[in-house]
């Protein structure tokens, strides 16, 4: 049986606890959260499963070397001491991605170039030739992490970031990252036990991720390539078994998933993505402004990703948020509504009292994922009903 080793799975800031739950559900041991990552112990099977089945994973990294370095010369010499000829062939390609923090290495790109130089110089010394660099689709992607003087070299088993699911063929402006969308859905606590609505769907990422979650479609279902497929120890039989076991869990969904947007361009793009994912019979897509929407009966979850940051002129923001609040209050009674925004001032114009605020990051933007419970009748009536039920 294969020995366990350490795995580091990266995610977006704010989704660490969601990622912990997903990885624990796969049977990982010694799982603990870090900043934008989760560390655990596992084997090749777990590494494959995280890559294929975990919705909030961006990268799955396998550490292989730790050492200390306080300057570029130290880094170069320590990297060159590693026998890269056992890890890479001259006819293969590689690249180095770097993340650095602390006072010793302040430029991540320079640190990555230092590691690259050490590797190719070793090959020149031994063979007189060197492997080439390929930043798009290398045979081996090396991840360099430096915190102060502590250096970790890791193999990137994912290759292209896992938020590239494979179903999104077109995007509208400023599309939501698929991993963030999957994380927001899980942060709501939705268990696929009621309706799901996205009233500003843009490219359709949130409703597609909701359908995949509800129907247990693995996040890697539409994807073709992973970094570990080019490793010498790639186990195609194990990978095939893992995919078949995960795909066998795909099921139907008994409630409604609605997606709408007032932009004809956005709806056309969303339609193309939904069709490519073969979810056109599972997602009800329409071109309709939010305030004209009559939601399905029975309540449910609403997630709204309104234009913000560079997506909207400042003069329009306050009016948009006022309109959102008015529409939620009058049209979405009985729904639990969530809104993601980076604009705390505009958020006050919703005019509803939040029942939860969760900090998350949407790329470089620090945001809040805010919950509004839209009661049927007044809050006073709801509390009176709850008091009667408890007596």
What name fits each language-model region?
Residues 142-158, 370, 379:
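C-terminal edge-of-domain segments
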Residues 2-138, 390-391:
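Non-catalytic nucleic-acid substrate-recognition regions in nucleic-acid-modifying enzymes
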Residues 154-187:
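SAM-dependent Rossmann-like transferase core, predominantly class I methyltransferases
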Residues 101-104, 161, 307-311:
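A short, flexible beta-alpha/helix-coil linker loop
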Residues 176-295, 310, 318-320:
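Conserved S-adenosyl-L-methionine
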Residues 49, 54, 160-165, 169, ...:
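Flexible, glycine-/basic-rich loop-and-beta segments that form/coincide
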Residues 289-292, 296-391:
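C-terminal catalytic and target-recognition region of SAM-dependent MTase-like enzymes
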Residues 11, 261, 341:
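Short beta-strand/turn micro-motifs composed of small residues
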């Amino acid at each position: 049986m294969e020995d366990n080793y350490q795995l580091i799975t990266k995610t977006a800031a704010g989704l660490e606890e969601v990622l912990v739950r997903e990885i624990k559900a796969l049977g990982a041991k010694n799982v603990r959260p870090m900043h934008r990552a989760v560390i655990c112990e596992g084997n090749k099977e777990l590494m494959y499963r995280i890559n294929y089945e975990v919705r909030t994973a961006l990268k799955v990294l396998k550490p292989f070397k730790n050492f200390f370095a306080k300057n570029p010369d130290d880094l170069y010499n320590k990297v060159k001491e590693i026998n890269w000829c056992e890890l890479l062939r001259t006819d293969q390609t590689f690249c180095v991605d770097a993340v650095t923090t602390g006072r010793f290495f302040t430029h991540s790109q320079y640190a990555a170039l230092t590691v690259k130089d050490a590797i190719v110089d070793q090959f020149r010394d031994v063979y007189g030739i060197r492997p080439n660099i390929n930043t798009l689709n290398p045979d081996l992607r090396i991840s360099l992490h430096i915190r102060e003087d502590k250096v970790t070299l890791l193999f990137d088993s994912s290759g292209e970031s896992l938020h590239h699911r494979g179903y999104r063929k077109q995007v509208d402006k400023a599309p939501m990252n698929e991993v963030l969308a999957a994380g927001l859905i899980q942060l709501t606590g939705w268990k696929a036990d009621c309706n799901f609505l996205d009233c500003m769907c843009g490219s359709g990422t949130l409703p597609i991720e909701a359908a995949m979650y509800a129907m247990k479609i693995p996040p890697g279902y539409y994807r073709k390539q992973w970094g570990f497929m080019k490793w010498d120890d790639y186990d195609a039989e194990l990978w095939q078994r893992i995919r078949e076991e995960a795909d066998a869990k795909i099921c139907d969904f008994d409630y409604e998933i609605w997606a709408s947007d007032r932009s004809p361009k956005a709806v056309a793009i969303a339609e193309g993505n939904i069709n490519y994912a073969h979810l056109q019979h599972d997602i009800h897509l329409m071109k309709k402004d939010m305030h004209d929407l009559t939601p399905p009966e029975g309540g449910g979850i609403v997630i709204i990703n309104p234009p913000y940051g560079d997506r909207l002129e400042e003069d329009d923001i306050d009016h948009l948020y006022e309109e959102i609040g008015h529409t939620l209050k009058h049209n979405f009674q009985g729904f639990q509504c969530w809104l993601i925004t980076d604009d705390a001032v505009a958020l006050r114009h919703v005019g509803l009292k939040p029942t939860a605020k969760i900090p998350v990051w949407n790329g470089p933007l620090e945001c809040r994922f805010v919950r509004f419970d839209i009661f049927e009748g007044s809050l006073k009536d709801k509390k009176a009903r709850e008091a009667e039920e408890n007596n």
